[in-house]
Amino acid sequence: MSGKKPTLAVVTLGCSKNQVDTEHLLAQIQDNYSIVNSESNADYLLLNTCGFIGDAKEESIQAVLEAAKRKKNGEVGKLLVFGCLSQRYIGELPKLMPEVDGWFGARDLNPLIKALGVEPKKEMLNRRVISDGVHSYAFLKISEGCDRRCSYCAIPFIRGAHKSVPIEDLVDEASSLAAQGIKELVLIAQDTTYYGLDIYHHRALAELLQKLSEIDGIEWIRIHYSYPADFPEDVLDQMAHNPKVCKYMDIPLQHISDKVLDMMHRHVDGAWTRALIQKMREKVPGVVLRTTMIVGHPGEGPKEFEELMDFVLKAKFERLGAFKYSEEEGTFDADNFKDTVSEKTKQNRLNKLMALQSGISFAFNKSRVGSVVKVLIDEYNDGNFVCRSEYESPEVDGEILVKYDSSAMRAKDPMSMIGTFINVKITQADEYDLIGDIVD
């Protein structure tokens, strides 16, 4: 390309893994395009879609339809769609939406990069373009795909088999992020605790944590999307003894009933799950646990749901999210079980579970009032810093709001403080957020 660069905008839908894919894409094409934040009048509009569950698919389809309308009205030039939705329905969507100029999958960005007139550069494989502004954290995708076959999940046939990124490549990528001012890495994958089995023939997450912690500038490393079956205990050793590894674990459990776990193909039972949670709390004192549950899965009757409620009450997860079961075509569930739990019952169970969790989260937050914690400043808005401690993960957990104090900050420009650490005394708490004051 010569002369004025064409403008290109990307809209990213879905999870943090999609965001990482977008950032890798932009690194490859940034020399050939002018990357813009506004979709209006962009020469190229790219949509990175999600196709995981019903609500996400609907959101992505609506986004494509709206973008197609804008293209028809002359507001955008070329319209290209990639990601999980197009990967999942690559055979059907081009016929249904011919106004889209190109459909690309989620497993390999190279066809899309080439369609944009750029030859993929090997030296840019571990580079990413972080969006405009100052950032304190970044997601680091350590593997692609999944070898698990949970009965409800469509990810394996969307994203393919598990494929670990070599440690040296991740260290290179993380070092590049640190050079851009990133202080916290959030490790993500479909199953982070499976990391390394395919290329090193053993679980290597603990080794990766150690290598990442040796990077200058990286201060916090956080683990998301761990899996309970065959959980590698050396990861807990890293968490307990490596000061850069946050005492925080995201471990989606999905249920506690033996019957439901078996139908879900989770490869654990309730006793194993309870023992693992106890071991985590014993080996890593003060660890904060985040989990995810599914309500309304086939086989979940009143008895199984009450068992789940009792487990959540006793386990006292500091963070918990929950979803209503969504039947997905092509999964084992869809082919073998009827979705017999009514939508009303699913919603009632979801409401009941989240009401219980609200009280647990509030009690945890109240217990922190009066404590002094190290926090990372993510944003500055309307006279307040938006911060997190090692016990809050970005984008999914609550925040710690701290009023800017020019005397305590020695009159520093508040915007220059984004991405730095300060000590804060917690003074107030609600169910999900905290308020604190700066301390010396």
Positions of the model-derived regions?
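Proteins enriched for Cys/Gly/acidic motifs involved in redox and nucleic-acid/cofactor modification
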Residues: 1-195, 234, 245, 249, ...
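Conserved SAM/AdoMet-binding glycine-rich loop
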Residues: 78-83, 88, 93, 179-303, ...
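Glycine-centered loop/turn positions within well-structured domains
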Residues: 110, 148, 193, 258-259, ...
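Conserved, mostly hydrophobic/aromatic
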Residues: 170, 187, 223, 251, ...
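Active-site proximal loops enriched in glycine and acidic residues that flank catalytic Cys/His/Asp
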Residues: 189, 225, 253-255, 291-295, ...
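Short acidic, glycine/proline-rich loop/turn micro-motifs
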Residues: 261-264, 332-336
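Terminal RNA-binding accessory module
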Residues: 336-440
